[in-house]
């Protein structure tokens, strides 16, 4: 324990001692070892972070957009220079394979920051003539202090997705990382400071989600909450934000996304996409296509192709460069996923491969769950209806296009969806009827910085990434100007 580093809060450009006197540990899910101890924020610390953010935001907003853009671009450069170091830390904290964190997590987060750094100078109002002597113009002004609440599956990427548009628009952000995977958010704060961000513009307060989340969502100074996490928690955050000061919210919540394989699909391509849509990041992706609909006439061939590919997955030490499937991010989450797998068996689904915990050799020390594929599934099963957030694929047979569209939409979620077909007209016809915010045709999973992402129904409110998101970190002020005489009416 003496060798374990203790991490403080990051407020006003430096590490500061938390006042709560409480700490919690970050656990390496590959072996159960403690990798860091973190101090937990108190309500007093939240107040300090808010005051700091208010001070820093005034300085930041007073800078020109070009100055803000240059600082954010410097942060991008530092992120890319330190990519491998950050990826190793992310792997230690999350259990995700280094082959993934080194090529995706930091890379895509930096891409989003670069995108919004470029848009900082494009924030502008408009001027509209009303008559010869009068016109009005608009200004897009920053909201002020905003808060981001992150999830545990993509810690640094989520921190960047939330902070990039907020900072580009001239706001300050207080960020609360998941207590399960808090380490890289602190590194990001260091990088922002190194790049020249004024003190207080990006503060990190870690600790128990329920307490800190409530303090942030109810704080009268904070103007917006951007939250990523589960549906039930999201509802509470949204209600609290509305009940306090009518804060604007962005909610990126859960999913149970359908992947529809059409009868004309190339089965090799379809199987590749299905495996990617279920087992990337050990299945811990909110957009996973966990309900895989396949024509009954092609079920046997598709199932065979999927099993062949799952057998090629390399489970192991996430730091090993050839590993492409690591442990789940925590031991409690592993138990939750295993309970879903058992319920699938009990409800009559057939295990084609996997179906339990990986216990061979050193894997027994970690939170490893075997990539699992179920067939003979029905729409009423828990594994088909509920978000598992783990490496569990459910294959469902169907007969007609109308049937599969109805079944795909028969869910409270609406985050993502996909179609695999060689008929592009059919692809668009199906996708246009699917109730989901992020859709893919003949591919799965890519979320470029330019593309807005978010859900329908209970999968979320608002969008992240893309041009539309930037506007939600500003407010519009309208100003009418009269150049002529003013005629009173009283």
Curated annotation (Swiss-Prot):
It holds the Pfam family Aldedh. It is an enzyme of class 1 (oxidoreductase). Its cofactor is K(+). GO terms for biological process: glycine betaine biosynthetic process from choline. Pathway: Amine and polyamine biosynthesis; betaine biosynthesis via choline pathway; betaine from betaine aldehyde: step 1/1. It catalyses: betaine aldehyde + NAD(+) + H2O = glycine betaine + NADH + 2 H(+). The record marks 248 as: Seems to be a necessary countercharge to the potassium cations. The gene is betB. Involved in the biosynthesis of the osmoprotectant glycine betaine. Catalyzes the irreversible oxidation of betaine aldehyde to the corresponding acid. Binds 2 potassium ions per subunit. This is Betaine aldehyde dehydrogenase. It comes from the Bacteria.
